[in-house]
Amino acid sequence: MKINGSSLKTFPSSFINIARKEKYIILLQNDTKTFKMNKRNLTFWQMWNLSFGFFGVQIAYALQSANISRIFATLGADPHQLSFFWILPPLMGMIVQPLIGKWSDRTWCRMGRRKPYLLVGAIVAVLVMLFLPNAGSLSFSSRLLLGLNGAMWFGLFSLIFLDTSINVAMQPFKMMVGDMVNEEQKGQAYSIQSFLCNAGSFVGYLFPIFFTWIGIANTAPEGVVPDSVKWSFYIGALILILCVLYTFVKVKEMDPKEYAEFHGIDLQKQEEKKGEGILSLLAHAPKAFWTVGLVQFFCWSAFLYMWTYTNGSIASTVWGTTDAASEGYQAAGNWVGVLFAVQAVGSMLWALLIPKFRSHRSAYVVSLVLGALGFISVFFIHDQYALFVSFLLIGAAWAAMLALPFTILTNSLSGEHMGEYLGLFNCTICLPQIVAAAIGGVVLKLVGGAQVSMMVVAGVLLLCGAAAVFAVKEKKD
């Protein structure tokens, strides 16, 4: 045990007992009344267990990302409408994630602090994943309401519930790392989370082409989602609940007293601050919250366009079709899963190199520039295998986006309001997607109507994000 500036007699006996038991390092601040415990380093497997459930959640998210445009195009959506369907996921995230952060900051029960939300979100996500791909198979009226048929309306409401539940299940993993990992290990912990995220993406993206390969039908009657996609969602739902249950059982969260001592929080002052509202939190947010948020705006706008238009882009440039009912379009849909899996591999490999950079900022810039080159190159490539290079480069940007923003932000925060700040920070993920989705149809017309042109737009947005990184400072403000 290491003592800075004082003897053990300075500290309360209960504090010393916990310190001895848990092998904390005690750091004395300006006076003997203010102290902080930095918890001993976690083992690799403890950090792995913290994030393992994220693997299953990310499979669900990957299935949603790779197949939503395909599903709604199959149900009859016009290409210029596709970006509007993508407003729903980030909109729900912007509403749900700050609430989960706020509520879980105030939740202390036998099951834990963040874990109850994780479990509820996973259960709801599993149920919705069983229904969403069946939207076209159920007997709905073909009568249009606001230009959408019954199947599309069912799909829309299913998408709302799916994304809400995924957000509820996803957010606690980020918070638990912030809660339970010391500053020295947070970069490693978020890198493990990034690895599991990309591994889950890899599996989820490949599911449709795998099920097609083993003989499950990849085509279906007009307006019906193919069985290969349905089975992808079914198996993804099973893996999701198993992975979340693993983390739920393996991880034990801190109790309120231990958490306060770990983060150096004065419980009395925290009680006085409990009524602090969102505006007050934003007013006292560290500078990194805003500067990294600006980078996030450009990055997530770019990836929203990738998720929305990749299917239509390669169906046109590689398979030469824009007919959503055609075999070529469905083959392109499967290949999108392969390309996104390649992106996940690129992310996993690049994540190993990110710690080698001298600073987070330089890693951030290089990663986003490589991703921009990958996006722009899609416009010029007409061979399905050559696109592997493009998506490996895109994977570099994705690796940085998953790990670096949260590392920089959580290192700038104290333990107080950790969940609320992370929930609010996720608005920097959701808001740009809403804006990009809302204007996507207009931008598509401005660039000539070819969906592949939106990949160039995505590349330009990433270059803007790389430029914005230079405003980021890594310190507690």
Residue map of PLM features:
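Intracellular loop-helix junctions on the cytosolic face of multi-pass helical membrane proteins
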Residues: 4, 10, 14-43, 141-142, ...
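Loop-to-transmembrane helix entry/capping segments in MFS-fold secondary transporters
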Residues: 79-80, 183-193, 415-425
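Helix-loop boundary and gating motifs at the non-cytosolic
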Residues: 38-92, 291, 295, 299-323
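Loop-to-transmembrane helix entry
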Residues: 78-88, 321-344, 453
